[in-house]
A protein has these predicted regions:
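Surface-exposed amphipathic alpha-helical segments
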Residues: 114-143
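Short, solvent-exposed recognition patches
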Residues: 1-112
Length: 143
């Protein structure tokens, strides 16, 4: 079976190896910071009748407070204004480690201080697409 999609390019030291077919062609990169964590973000969006709709977001997160997967979860819960205790997440395999996924979002701790977060529009794609995108992301070699 061939999974249709395209390459997502490089973002802040990572390569996004797969973007689902049907993700918008308008691609934008952003840099931001929230609660002492820096975000390097790439967004795929498409034009809709009343403006634009985001289909896929990939965030590379850097910050001293991101030392464990549970701390990444708590940080993202605050960022998304969710109660981390009420956020239904499940583990997914990520190389020799695990990440957490739920509701079209997949994230993992690369190492202390560095995490990656993937979000897909669940009205456009199956929630599992976030895991497929996450599984395609590789850290680039230094230098």
């Amino acid at each position: 079976m061939t999974v249709q999609g395209r390459d997502g390019g490089d973002l802040d030291g990572f390569h996004v190896g797969w973007v689902p077919e049907g993700a918008g062609e308008l691609v934008s990169d952003f840099a931001s910071e929230w609660e002492d964590v820096s975000f390097a973000s790439r967004v795929w969006e498409r034009a809709v009748e009343d403006g634009y709709r985001v289909d896929l977001r990939v965030h590379v997160l850097r910050g001293e407070r991101l030392t464990t997967l549970l701390q990444v979860r708590d940080f993202l819960a605050g960022y998304h204004e969710r109660d981390s205790a009420e956020w239904p997440l499940a583990e997914f395999g990520r190389g020799d480690g695990v990440g957490l996924t739920g509701g079209g979002e997949a994230f993992w701790l690369v190492r202390p201080g560095l995490a990656v977060d993937v979000l897909v529009d669940v009205d456009r794609f199956d929630a599992e697409a976030s895991i497929e995108v996450a599984s395609s992301i590789r850290e680039l070699p230094l230098g």
